[in-house]
Amino acid sequence: MLLFTAAVAVAAPLSLGTAAAQTTLVPAQDAASLLGSQQAQGAVIWSHGRSLLKECSLAPTPEYIGVFRAAGWDTFRLNRPRITDTLPASGAALAEAAETLKQRGYRRVVLAGQSFGAFISLIAAGRGDAVDAVIGTAPAAYGSAESNPGGFLQNASGLYDLLGAVRRARVALFFFDGDIFDPGGRGPVADRILAAHGLSHLVIDKPAGLSTHWAAAGTTFATQYASCLVGFAAARLAAGAFDCGAQGAPAQIAGMGGVTTPSPAPARFTSLPQGNSASVIDLESGRREDVNRVLRRR
């Protein structure tokens, strides 16, 4: 059963469906600071990862989610006990939460997730139209080469299947150097899939200065990408791939002027020509690589 706390509902508590026992949607900020559906820019639900050894529901919310709050969004997290945390059950629970927030009047619903949380965010985005954007950092659900040698590659193939099933949401994905759960090569393929489906998307592949599976949790990631992600989540962008300049690189969202956030170093976007839409950002070399050329080299 999915439980909504009173603070989340900004009303009476509400129990929904049977998606996952004791899975709970709670505020990721002080409950008194929630703006409510009529005043907030939208709602963000962050989903933690999954571990066989500890309860990831106790993990802190990453710093970049706080920038959404500062920009006028209401922020939540989906807490899931590991004993009941499966892709089908948690994906269904998250889809249910997104639908409920949309029905309660939030103009935008964004799902952000780390690792296993990224997978269930994409699952939810494939189940209905309530999800406006997905932010997935270090997506994984099938262990490492050491812990699951027979299934580790599903961190790639499973991801591709989920990307192909996204119905309408914008998708931002981050892959990090030194991630033991990453089979490698996922950035270009993910970009190609999203482009083929006509979805607005952002792929950041192994950015310099950010390494390991948990790179998105800290200050460095938030400083470089949080305000950019706020803009990506809020903007009405045409289909294609978009450049997210790190550290507040100046650019404009095509046809929209700029994106205003309270971040001290706001990053904005540049729309690429249609012929460049099938590309992935390579921050190590400082250029965008054509997907087909990258794949031919493999």
Where are these regions (language model features)?
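Alpha/beta-hydrolase active-site loop
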Residues: 84-104
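Conserved alpha/beta-hydrolase
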Residues: 67-84
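The feature captures the conserved acid-bearing segment of alpha/beta-hydrolase catalytic domains
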Residues: 36, 139-203
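Gly/Ala-rich beta-loop-alpha elbow adjacent to hydrolase catalytic centers
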Residues: 112-121
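Residue in the alpha/beta-hydrolase core beta-strand immediately N-terminal to the catalytic nucleophile
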Residues: 110, 133-135
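C-terminal catalytic histidine-bearing segment of alpha/beta-hydrolase fold enzymes
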Residues: 197-269, 273-288, 292-295
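Short, surface-exposed "cap/lid" segments of acyl-processing enzymes
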Residues: 37-68
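Short beta-strand-to-loop junctions in surface cap/lid or active-site-entrance loops
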Residues: 24-40
